[in-house]
Amino acid sequence: MMTHLRPALASLLALSLLTGVAYPLALTGIAAVIAPDRAAGSLILREGQVVGSALIGQGFDGPGYLHPRPSASDWNAAGTFASNLGPTSAALLAEVQERQAAYEARNGASAPVDAVTASGSGLDPHVSPANARAQAARIARARGLDEAAVRRLIEAHVEPPLLGLWGQARVDVLAVNLALDAAGA
């Protein structure tokens, strides 16, 4: 039995060190050289302070800010998850209807799908252009800005599909909110 156990344990230890330590460290080192900002989490800095990440969404609920998609994890990056409610769930339907009513009351516009449904991770940093445009009037009122100026700012932050082919156009919520704050209104 020992003749089989010793090589098996040695293989387990060697592969554990290789795949659990050496490989992740090598990839982290390569990433730090090739793309240091991405290896560090794509952090966004303002005046030397981290204000967010380009990859992880965060909640904004003030009337003068662009609101993100709903988050099942309450914007907790340590515990990302979806609601796990099935498409035929009465609880999910009630949740979506509640979000829809709140969105339409806040914005005076019909709610796009991404405004009432959480993403799979619960931390999506983007909304659809339709969602962002529907919020423009509320943002302009709250900040005392011309609605056309807010719409121009939103349009300036629309990101096209990757290579024009994959995915959908999207708007980075944090980028728009930082631009709104920088505009001084």
UniProtKB/Swiss-Prot annotation:
Localization: Cell inner membrane
Coiled coil: none
Keywords: ATP-binding, Cell inner membrane, Cell membrane, Ion transport, Membrane, Nucleotide-binding, Potassium, Potassium transport, Transmembrane, Transmembrane helix, Transport
Major localization listed first in the record, in broad terms: membrane
Membrane topology: Single-pass membrane protein
Disulfide bridge partners, by residue number: none
Naturally occurring in which organism (per UniProt): Cereibacter sphaeroides (strain ATCC 17023 / DSM 158 / JCM 6121 / CCUG 31486 / LMG 2827 / NBRC 12203 / NCIMB 8253 / ATH 2.4.1.) (Rhodobacter sphaeroides)
Family label: Belongs to the KdpC family.
GO molecular-function terms, A-Z: ATP binding; P-type potassium transmembrane transporter activity
Protein name in UniProt: Potassium-transporting ATPase KdpC subunit
InterPro entries: KdpC
Subunit-structure text: The system is composed of three essential subunits: KdpA, KdpB and KdpC.
CC per GO annotation: plasma membrane
Function: Part of the high-affinity ATP-driven potassium transport (or Kdp) system, which catalyzes the hydrolysis of ATP coupled with the electrogenic transport of potassium into the cytoplasm. This subunit acts as a catalytic chaperone that increases the ATP-binding affinity of the ATP-hydrolyzing subunit KdpB by the formation of a transient KdpB/KdpC/ATP ternary complex.
Superkingdom of this protein's organism: Bacteria
Transport among keywords: yes
Alphabetized Pfam families for the sequence: KdpC
Chain ranges passing through the membrane: 14-34
